[in-house]
Every structure is written in C-alpha cells, then in structure tokens.
Amino acid sequence: MTDTSLQLNIWKFYLFKVFEGFVLYYSIDKILMESRELSVTDMVQVEIVFAVFLLIFEIPSGAISDRWSRKYVLAINVVFFMLNTFLWAIAQDISLFMIGAFAASISSALKSGTDTSFLYDTLLEFSKEETYEKTLGNAIFYESIAAIVAGIAGAMIADYYGLAAPFWLTLIFSFIAVLLALSLREPEIQRTTEEVTYWEHIVSTGRFLWRHPFIYHLIFLTVILGATLNLADEYGQLYFVRVGIPIFVFGYLAAVGNGIEAISAKFSHKLRCYSRGKIYTFLIFVSGGGFVLTGALKSPFGAVFIFLPLLAYYVSCPLISSDLHREFSSGQRATGESFISLLKMTVYIPVALGFGLIADRVSVFSAYITVGAFVGLYLIIFVLVSFRKIGHIETIES
C-alpha cells in the first residue's frame, strides 16, 4: 500500500464513520418508546434482548471478521442497523421493538472490534501503528461532529414532523455508509487464522486472554466504564423529561454529549505520556461522581453532571484500546475485542435490570445514585488491586 492509498483508505474510513454515525433519532428514541406506552422496565427489557443476543453473536462475529473480510463485515453491520431503524419506526408495541433490538444486536456484534481492527491493521501495514490513538481519536472526532449535527437536527425534525420522522431519514445516511464500507481497501495482513478452524481460532484467542492475567485489569476497566456509560447515554432522556426539559432541547443536550466525545477522542492521545494508573483512577472517580450528582440534584442543573460518565469513558477509550491492541496479534484483534464486548454485556444486563426496577419502583434519580455507588465500589477495587498492574503495562510502553 502506497502513501496515497493509505491516506485514501483512512479518509474513506473517516467518511464511513461519519455516515454510520449520522443517526437522527438517538436523542429521542426513548421518548418514542414512551409515547408508544413502554415503561422504563419495558425499555430495559428491549435492551436486555439486545444484550442477550449480542452475547450469543459477539465472539463468532469477531472471528468472522478476523478470518473473512473486515470491510464486508462493516457493510453488513450497517445493513442490520438499517433493519433495526426500520422496525423501530413502525413499531407500535414492545414486540417489534424487541425484534428491532435483535437486528441491532447482530449489527453491534459485527461492528465490535472490526472497525478498530481494520484501522490498526491499515496503519500497521505501513508501520504507522504508533499513530493509532491519534487516528482513532480523529475518527471518533469526525463521527461525533456528525452526531452533534444529527442530534440537533433530529430533535427539531421530531418536534415539527413527529417522533418517527428522524428514523426514516436516518436510513438514507446509513445506505451511504454501506457504499463507503464496500469501497474500502482491505489491509494486506498475514492471516494466521487460515491455519486453524473457526472454533479453534475462538478457543485460542480465549486462551491467550486467560494466560495474560494483567490484561484483565484493562478489560474490567473498559467493561465497567462502558457498561455504566450506556445508562447515562441511553436513559438520560428520561431524566431530562422528569426535570422539565422540553423535547426540542434534547438535540442540543445530545450535541453536548457528542461534543464531549469528539474533544475527548481528539486530544486523549496527548495523555499517553502520563501515568495510566493515575489517569484511569481519576476517570473512574469522575464517572461515579457524575452518576451520584445527577441523581442527587433532581433538577435541570443535575443534567450537567450526567455528561461526566461520558467524559470519563471517551477520554479513556483510545488509551485503553491502544493498550489492548498492542497485546493482540493481527489475526486475533476483532475476536479479542469481541470477548471484551461480551464481558461488557454480561455486566450491563444485571446493572440495567436493577436500574429499570429502581427507576420504576422508586425513581430515575435513585437509579442513577445506585449506579454511582456501583462505580464507587469498583474504584476501591481498582485502587487496591489494579493500580500496580496498570503501572506495569505503562512501564513497558514507555
């Protein structure tokens, strides 16, 4: 691959992330569900359907990406996302929302680890893997800018034309993302997985993770921050409604969240020279504190703090991803990330169920405080158990 073709592939990847991330309904999807008479527990049940099937598909899909083609897997992932969008647009009860969640689980499983593995291997082919954090940060930055525009526009469209309109319009941008994925050039990486069977490849990746215990600490860090992030990201809309924030403002609030993601991803690589242990400890504290303050304040001012878990996760994401990818071989990247996503969903299912039950039986505010306490408990475990192990990794890196 020449310099020109490398740059072209990277920019096509950026464009793919932009159109894939241009989802007009993310700022109002829970409001659509509530308008169609779903309770918070119903919404969590839809999420559980997504999570359970993601657990089933996660590892096999990662192996498909490692053994077949990453660009085709990226394209198919968007096709299933389009099916999810269509089903939710026409859903009138929980059953179609659940079927849509099933399609979304396939989409998410196919995407998991495939996009970052494609990017890392593209850079590795040209010996530029040291720029991975920065390049991944750029991709997230551009995707987040698109999401900001989509969030604001989607809320306005929903306010003027109805809650279903943003779903229909999103399909156009998703179709363009499919075409962009198909135009990508597959990096020429030696695929050692051709020498083993499909299931042997999965087992060998699992054994690799099992034999490197210090990786556990990185994995559990991203699992806890990522699983709890979903509760702030997905159910923040319900908090906003309960503190009296009007729907048309939701797009601007989503823009704030996406702006945090964009800026965090863009500049987090500058933190690579600092102590990973101290950075991660601080970010866990920020995440837990954000949940507690959000639930305790019970006001529009409390909505400010719901963005702290997003800040913590998106600052950590490129750093943790880089640490993990340096440990995986090329043929194990997507499968390894799929194992991590599986663990994330394993944690998310009981946490989300507890969140939904507390939100329905007590209040959304109490549910957020409980999540904050859960993150606080992990902070204690991280400081006592993981801090030194993370320090060992950063010594190797520096």
Regions found by a protein language model. Give the residues of each.
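Helix-loop junctions on the cytosolic side of multi-pass membrane transporters
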Residues: 163, 170-196, 384-396
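C-terminal transmembrane bundle of multi-pass solute transporters/carriers
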Residues: 46, 59, 71, 239-398
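Helix-loop boundary and gating motifs at the non-cytosolic
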Residues: 2-56, 212-255
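Hydrophobic core of transmembrane alpha-helices in multi-pass small-molecule transporters
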Residues: 18, 84, 95-111, 301-316
